[in-house]
Amino acid sequence: HGSHDEIAKWHQIIRQIENELDSPIAILADLQGPKLRVGEFANGVEELIVGEKFRLDLSDEIGTKNRVRLPHPEIFQALHEGAHLLINDGKIKLTVEKCGLDFADCSIVNGGEISDRKGVNVPDVILPLAALSEKDRADLDFICELGIDWLALSFVQRADDIIEASNLVAGRAAIISKIEKPSAVKSFEDILKVSDGIMVARGDLGVELPVQNVPPIQKRLVRKCRAAAKPVIVATQMLESMVESPMPTRAEVSDVATAIYEGSDAIMLSAESAAGQFPIQAVETMNNVAIEVESDPTYTEVMEASRRAKRNSVADGIVSAAREIAETTDLSLIHISEPTRQPC
């Protein structure tokens, strides 16, 4: 979201605050990724009725209650009979009965209102989409030249998506792969190997998969990231009620705490701070929960119990020994220096 001028302004503000606080602040830039949307309707909105038929096609004609343009030929190339399409964050569900290279005739499984340019998800297939759109490529080059720390890739499906982005980034930023599609879950081990970090983006993941599948997937992905020594972020709808309320629900607080107890390296706000009415309170709440959990003796016990077998390298042995010394003697700082660099 936002123009390059707006992004440059936000970047400058963050760096100014960083200097004022004399504390490093990492900046993560989130690329939009391939967004799939339907076209427009003559009336702006139509009501789809369960059991009736609805067509998606490439025609330029304005949408009606019976059909609408879906300007993505790559979707039709990948569809098959029995495949599902989810529209408007999964509120509308269609099942493909017949399809060709420029159309899909569907039955309406879950009905409701459909309006102009609503998003489309296709959970059953790997779409032949480029990992980066032309807009993404332009944005990527701009923000890397601006000077960011992390780059988040949206809707990755396979390891090749990250490799393509890495070649363009060329070491100017570290790459976070957002796991928000079933295909990414299936290919997670390969994606993890070529990523600098992972974001468990539960929003779209919960649209394309049954919602009850998301918590165990979150737990498994976090554990795999810890085992691989890769940072992992848990994101989306963590304090969703704070978009409109100054206080979170108890369930939301528990959800945030659970993500921390699982071993997440970061917990992330979305609409709460980007578009909500109480952004400062949301950040304060998130921070307070993190401080409380990490000061709980149970947290240390859980992290210790979940530690995997040590690796056998000399570096891992040194780090493990330093950790034991720090814990045993209650050190507040470990000083590390290299001959070719300034002490850090």
Which stretches of residues belong to each language-model region?
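Glycine-rich, proline-tolerant flexible connector loops at the mouths of alpha/beta enzymes
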Residues: 1-11, 150-158, 205-210, 271-279
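Alpha-helix-loop-beta-strand connector modules within alpha/beta enzyme cores
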Residues: 12-29, 165-174, 217-235, 285-299
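Active-site beta-loop-alpha junctions enriched in small/polar residues
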Residues: 32-34, 59, 90, 109-111, ...
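Beta-strand/loop-dominated core regions that host nucleotide or nucleotide-derived cofactor-binding catalytic loops
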Residues: 33, 38-140
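Long, charged amphipathic helices and adjacent flexible linkers at domain junctions
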Residues: 119, 128, 176-179, 227, ...
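Conserved alpha/beta-domain cores
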Residues: 128-236, 242-253, 260
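Short beta-alpha connecting loops at secondary-structure transitions
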Residues: 206-207, 238-252, 266-277, 303-307
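Residue-level detector of conserved catalytic or cofactor/ligand-binding positions
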Residues: 332-342
